[in-house]
Amino acid sequence: MILMNPKTSKILWLLGFLSLLSSFSLEIAAQTTQNINVLFINEVDNEPAAKAVEVVLTYLKKNIRYGLSVQLDSIEANKSDAKVLLEAICNKYATSIEKKQTPHLILDTTKSGIASETVKSFTQALGLPTISASYGQQGDLRQWRDLDEAKQKYLLQVMPPADIIPEAIRSIVIHMNITNAAILYDDSFVMDHKYKSLLQNIQTRHVITAIAKDGKREREEQIEKLRNLDINNFFILGTLQSIRMVLESVKPAYFERNFAWHAITQNEGEISSQRDNATIMFMKPMAYTQYRDRLGLLRTTYNLNEEPQLSSAFYFDLALRSFLTIKEMLQSGAWPKDMEYLNCDDFQGGNTPQRNLDLRDYFTKITEPTSYGTFDLVTQSTQPFNGHSFMKFEMDINVLQIRGGSSVNSKSIGKWISGLNSELIVKDEEQMKNLTADTVYRIFTVVQAPFIMRDETAPKGYKGYCIDLINEIAAIVHFDYTIQEVEDGKFGNMDENGQWNGIVKKLMDKQADIGLGSMSVMAEREIVIDFTVPYYDLVGITIMMQRPSSPSSLFKFLTVLETNVWLCILAAYFFTSFLMWIFDRWSPYSYQNNREKYKDDEEKREFNLKECLWFCMTSLTPQGGGEAPKNLSGRLVAATWWLFGFIIIASYTANLAAFLTVSRLDTPVESLDDLAKQYKILYAPLNGSSAMTYFERMSNIEQMFYEIWKDLSLNDSLTAVERSKLAVWDYPVSDKYTKMWQAMQEAKLPATLDEAVARVRNSTAATGFAFLGDATDIRYLQLTNCDLQVVGEEFSRKPYAIAVQQGSHLKDQFNNAILTLLNKRQLEKLKEKWWKNDEALAKCDKPEDQSDGISIQNIGGVFIVIFVGIGMACITLVFEYWWYRYRKNPRIIDVAEANAERSNAADHPGKLVDGVILGHSGEKFEKSKAALRPRFNQYPATFKPRF
């Protein structure tokens, strides 16, 4: 017998009581514990889901307060063979039926693709209550589309965080107005179903592609290909390791201001990279403060450490919530007692068991605390649950600057709360703008004044109507651009093999974003590229020719006759004048030799040499020469001169009139028909231009109609009646364009506009050339050059528009901008600037018209003749006055001097000394007086010498 200490006995009694109490509690708990059967289907590589479900089971065992025991059967689903997976599921399900352990719930954590759709098909066909964490929004789960109302209550889907996080890209694109984007993702995200829905109804050109896994070189090539698609906004969805690999594969030049990089991850760490200079936007999840303690407990106590924490916490909370939902339904009596379970082999396509099971209602009402974020579940029965339910959490937005291979600065500038169409919450808008890539578009153009002209002093090296237009559009749409000329100088034409050149080819090859210039909208171009609304009026083809001009001359009247003719006329004038003087001097019947005979005539005209010159000159004028010589021989000479002068004057007058009017009477080419009918002037458009295409196609169309006519006319199978009906159709098809196209080919099409202008300017009367081209180009050349003119009316009119890539978002943006400028009359101001106020416009003389009179440029020489004649007369007057005033006059002598001189005259008869005639008396003296008298008649009476 053992004696106990009373104190020891008391302790033993207390321990026994506690043991009994514990056993009683366990027995009570065992009686209230709810057992449920769950079939867990998970993909092979979805470790966070597998680990989370395992932790849930441990968590429930250690927390008996839940009163829940889960009998879990697991299936690892392969992602490539639906048949194998379906057999595995059916076998597991059949076994549970045999054991009478049919699953209350199918917990599906397959992600997407074959595995997910196989599970959805299985559960939908057999009517099994399912809670799925598969990826996809409404309509993405093909096997769960168009569910009836009953199935919508027990086939539920909650989107995992990795399916919600890509929606942040949509929010960023909208907030920052991004027009292009490349989205690279790794295996931690599933994007197959996001291609159409992610940026739907947003004017953002984007590419979604998986990150190249082969190596750094492959990733570099991948990024280079994306750059060739003219993308400068990059989004990286992946683990921190994947983000680092991509960043280290990027060329340093791609971190400049015209590029933007965004890294988005499910992990909570920091980015490490060997980049020397990079600034990126970094988004990572951030647990709500109120849940951090619970998450820490799960990580430390229950070993919920699988990365990423966000996914692990989601799967944990989803599994726990799902199990508690089944428990609540079972204990509340909401679970049907006569659940029918159909084996896979018994399913015949339309015998799915009918369920009266509202799993959705109980699932949304569970109030169990979460470990990372709350569940945002659709509670309204009228709204779809699947594709709209998810876990709500925050993503922190950071500006991350990497210098020298490490993050030197990380600043939080906002946050994004997970959701569909959730907006960014930005704290620092200025920093957010700095993360935006400068939108720079590549423009290719063709120099064509006044639309595009080179100017080294201009900001972009070019000026013109289109440069001003694109600058106005850029101010509205907010972008920058680079501009360069296309190598071949062509807007774009398609050859016989369907190959394009010029700007069109650049746009098709994605080497250009915008085609700018005087580019016509053509049907075949619209097949491969897009055009904006027209920014200019309809422009057709017209004709440019050299302006006809006759050289003007002040002495035009002298050019009527050639120099040799003028010299001959002058020689005839002097010869006739000299001959008339000789005849008058030697003819015994002339006035000077018969003064007594003609002393009573009113006209006493002595034809000395001076008088003969005057007579012949005045005879050529309407005034006439005056009195003719008295002798017959002189009159014959005068008559001959008059006849000669009449013929010369008549010929001169006729030629002068012809010279002044013939240039204005030439019939010019006034239309395309006139050009086609003549053969003197060659004509052609630019090689490869739209005008060339027009004439070539018109020629081909005429040829096609000719072939049709020929086939009908020469068809021997036609009956006489049928042939008679075609009798009126002899040859109604015009060959106008066929002949014109042949003439153009013979004339050789110019390669450039400068060559065409040079050929027009070098045109002569024998080898003329006319250029056919766009009316705007030709009209501008006319405005800037006085030797060119526009001929005829425009034809084949087409609008000018800006070209963009087919399907480009720029089309709608530019359309809105152009319409805005049109409403503001800004386009009219540009026309005014470049067509009326341009400094390059030439000030040309008014072209001559047939109704205009003779210009001063051609007749002004006669006024010069008048002024020269009047000037010579004035000079002669001065000389006469001088001669009269300062010549040596005869002196007056007295009688004594006269007597002395008379004595001297005897020795020198007939000599004039100091105005006195020295002579002698008698017959000889009288004869001397008679001979010298005419000589002194020219002196005034006061100064006549004394005899």
From Swiss-Prot:
Pfam families: Ion_trans_2, Lig_chan, Lig_chan-Glu_bd. Glycans are attached at residues 78, 177, 277, 434, 687, 715, 762. The chain crosses the membrane at residues 563-583, 642-662, 859-879. GO terms for cellular component: axon; cilium; membrane; perikaryon; plasma membrane; sensory dendrite; synapse. SUPFAM superfamilies: Periplasmic binding protein-like I, Periplasmic binding protein-like II, Voltage-gated potassium channels. One of its GO terms (molecular function) is coreceptor activity. Interacts with nocte. This is Ionotropic receptor 25a. It comes from Drosophila melanogaster. The lineage of its organism: Eukaryota, Metazoa, Ecdysozoa, Arthropoda, Hexapoda. The gene is Ir25a.
